[in-house]
């Protein structure tokens, strides 16, 4: 997951707002969130609501950074396409600007997904940083105010695989989390269906270290918007402490789930490493580790290959026990990320069109194989193909 002022022709005028963060009173636990809304609605039919195993078990489709196989990620166009293509949820990854505004970026590094390098006025901002163990040289979101970010334009991250998406380079600005909420609310009203949000708090330990902690800003935004008070929100993180903090603040609410992201490797979450802990992601994926996750989270989200690993030849192997192990302790399993190009598919689902070619049939077939594991939802760069796999 590991990732505008809006062109008039693509915006629904009159709903995009840049609301101020709510006051300290809205940072209280779930009781305040409840108090700011009217009587609790019946959420049983909403996407993402309901216990594991309850009701018809159709996996949820999460639009990964929107429909990022078809439009530049985290843009209005990407989210609009994901919604039009049937995503149950759309995903904004959240980073902080220098002035404390939460914006949708997959990582703090701006150079791969915006045209910042072409802005001479920002040349002096180029620097080198190591964030979550990765070192990059370029430009970073926390060195820019929101007003400065709004002068940049989004570009396609993977143009060699997604030339169709790259045609939209330069058309869209960086979105705030609040703009995404308002856009989602308007789309839900226009389409007559609930659309969930699955935001990820990115680099929490890093942002806290530079005086820009994400969590309370995030909570105040959830509380300030009627849509996020009432409708499905799944909150993701690769870290542990911030999810535990969220659980303490939010309590148990029917429309909210906490999602522990994991990788199936023997490395530590960043907050664990900083605190000198020894817990690794690999340990978190064991039955004992999953039991611990279930004490504070509702969902575990591993990479897809943790459910069905690859053989040495790149084809799919036998199904692992992860889904069954997670379900035994009451966790949903919602892996990431299905991508429709041959390069990203298991070898047994590729065609002969070349490594960079888009392969819709292969992608649908691969997703179907994973649906058979019993997973409860999945992230995909192309929600239309995810929806087709469920048909």
Where are these regions (language model features)?
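Conserved, mostly hydrophobic/aromatic
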Residues: 64, 82, 93, 149, ...
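C-terminal active-site rim and adjoining tail of enzyme catalytic domains
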Residues: 207-208, 249, 253-391
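N-terminal secretory signal peptides
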Residues: 1-11, 21-28
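C-terminal segment of N-terminal export signals and the immediately downstream linker at the start
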Residues: 30-62
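N-terminal binding-site loop/beta-alpha segment at the start of enzyme catalytic domains
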Residues: 57-89
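Metal-dependent phosphodiesterase/phospholipase catalytic core, i.e.
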Residues: 106-284, 288-289, 296-298, 302-309, ...
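Acidic helix-start/capping segments at beta-turn-to-alpha-helix junctions
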Residues: 96-105
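Catalytic domains of carbohydrate-active enzymes, especially glycoside hydrolases
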Residues: 81-94, 292-299
């Amino acid at each position: 997951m590991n990732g505008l002022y809006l062109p008039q022709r693509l915006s629904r005028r009159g709903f995009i707002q840049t609301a101020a963060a709510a006051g300290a009173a809205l940072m209280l636990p779930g009781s305040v969130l409840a108090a700011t809304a009217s009587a609790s609605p019946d959420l049983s039919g909403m996407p993402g609501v309901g216990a594991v195993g309850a009701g018809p078990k159709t996996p949820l489709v999460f639009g990964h950074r929107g429909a990022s196989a078809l439009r530049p990620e985290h843009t209005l166009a990407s989210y609009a396409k994901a919604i039009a293509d049937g995503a149950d949820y759309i995903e904004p990854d959240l980073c902080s600007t220098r002035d404390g505004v939460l914006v949708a970026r997959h990582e703090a590094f701006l150079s791969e997904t915006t045209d910042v390098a072409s802005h001479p006025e920002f040349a002096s901002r180029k620097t080198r940083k190591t964030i979550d163990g990765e070192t990059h040289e370029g430009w970073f979101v926390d060195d820019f105010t929101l007003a400065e970010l709004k002068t940049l334009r989004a570009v396609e991250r993977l143009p060699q695989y997604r030339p169709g998406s790259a045609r939209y380079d330069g058309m869209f600005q960086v979105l705030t989390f609040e703009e995404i909420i308002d856009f989602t609310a308007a789309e839900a009203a226009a389409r007559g269906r609930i659309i969930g949000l699955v935001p990820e708090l990115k680099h929490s330990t890093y942002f806290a270290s530079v005086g820009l902690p994400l969590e309370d800003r995030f909570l105040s935004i959830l509380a300030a918007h009627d849509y996020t008070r009432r409708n499905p929100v799944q909150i993701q993180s690769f870290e542990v402490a911030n999810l535990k903090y969220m659980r303490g603040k939010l309590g148990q609410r029917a429309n909210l789930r906490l999602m522990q992201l994991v990788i199936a490797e023997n490395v530590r979450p960043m907050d664990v490493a900083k605190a000198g802990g020894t817990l690794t992601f690999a340990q978190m994926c064991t039955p004992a580790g999953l039991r611990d996750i279930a004490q504070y989270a509702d969902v575990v989200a591993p990479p897809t290959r943790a459910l069905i690993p690859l053989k040495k030849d790149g084809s799919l192997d036998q199904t692992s026990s992860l889904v069954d192990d997670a379900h035994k302790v009451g966790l949903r399993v919602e892996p990431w990320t299905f991508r429709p190009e041959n390069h990203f598919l298991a070898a047994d689902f590729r065609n002969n069109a070349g490594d960079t070619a888009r392969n819709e049939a292969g992608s649908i077939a691969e997703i179907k194989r994973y649906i058979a594991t019993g997973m409860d939802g999945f992230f995909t760069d192309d929600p239309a193909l995810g929806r087709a796999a469920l048909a």
